[in-house]
């Protein structure tokens, strides 16, 4: 119905947000979701549980439309593996990385694939054993202990030309905070900020008492000169 790809993207964003408003346990993979959604006490706290998705969509659509503005810049958006993307981009000042919380027991595909599956209209999806598993399984390289250290090494090597990094993390993740800080320190000066969850919000990563971590990374104290800047200096005779 919508031929404009930008309007299509906004519509998908709104319908996905409408669906997440009906989540009961922090994700879509909980087998007791319908039971919890029928609990009168839960309904009191979240009326969206019993509201039609269309009604929620119509309520929040104006907010999304009002958020659209022209920043007078040429903007780009990418949807691909970060290790494939980084070698292709340049002139980036700041990178924010939000990797999966390895070893937190969060099955991101099982918990949240519904949104992508809906948006892609079941493209290339094959469900196996009823609703228990689906194919193809996608592996990021950051969610298995055997792969994650090597993947982070590649991530940081490919990000050498980006001066500043922000990295979201969780103190329940692998590698641990000290080991991860040591790994980052090979490439950047790093400061660690922590925020403790006092209440659980669903999912293993946000249980009460766990900490959300932010690694604030900046160039080492010696003056940072990117490869592009080095070439400019050479061209100018320095």
Across the structure, where does each feature detected by a protein language model lie?
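SAM-dependent nucleic-acid methyltransferase catalytic core
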Residues: 1-110, 123-137
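Generic recognition of flexible, low-complexity loop/linker segments
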Residues: 82-85, 153-156, 201-203
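Glycine-rich, phosphate-binding/catalytic loops in enzymes
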Residues: 107-115, 183-185
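Conserved Class I SAM-dependent methyltransferase catalytic core
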Residues: 139-188
């Amino acid at each position: 119905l919508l031929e404009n790809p930008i309007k299509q993207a906004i519509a998908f964003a709104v319908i996905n947000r409408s669906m997440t408003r009906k989540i009961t346990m922090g994700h879509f993979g909980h087998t007791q979701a319908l039971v919890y959604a029928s609990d009168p006490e839960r309904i009191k706290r979240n009326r969206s549980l019993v509201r039609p998705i269309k009604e929620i969509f119509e309520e929040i659509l104006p907010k999304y439309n009002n958020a659209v503005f022209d920043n007078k810049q040429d903007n780009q958006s990418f949807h691909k593996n970060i290790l494939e993307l980084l070698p292709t981009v340049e002139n980036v000042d700041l990178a924010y990385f939000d990797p999966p919380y390895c070893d937190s027991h969060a099955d991101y595909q099982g918990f949240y694939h519904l949104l992508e599956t809906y948006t892609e209209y079941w493209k290339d999806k094959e469900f196996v054993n009823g609703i228990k598993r689906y194919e193809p399984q996608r592996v990021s390289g950051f969610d298995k202990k055997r792969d994650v250290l090597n993947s982070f090494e590649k991530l940081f090597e490919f990000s050498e030309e980006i001066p500043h990094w922000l990295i979201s993390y969780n103190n329940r993740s692998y590698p641990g905070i000290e080991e991860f800080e040591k790994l980052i320190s090979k490439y950047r000066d790093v400061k660690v900020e922590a925020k403790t969850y006092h209440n659980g919000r669903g999912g293993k990563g946000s249980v009460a008492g766990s900490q959300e971590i932010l690694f604030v990374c900046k160039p080492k104290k010696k003056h940072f000169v990117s490869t592009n800047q080095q070439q400019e200096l050479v061209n100018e005779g320095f």
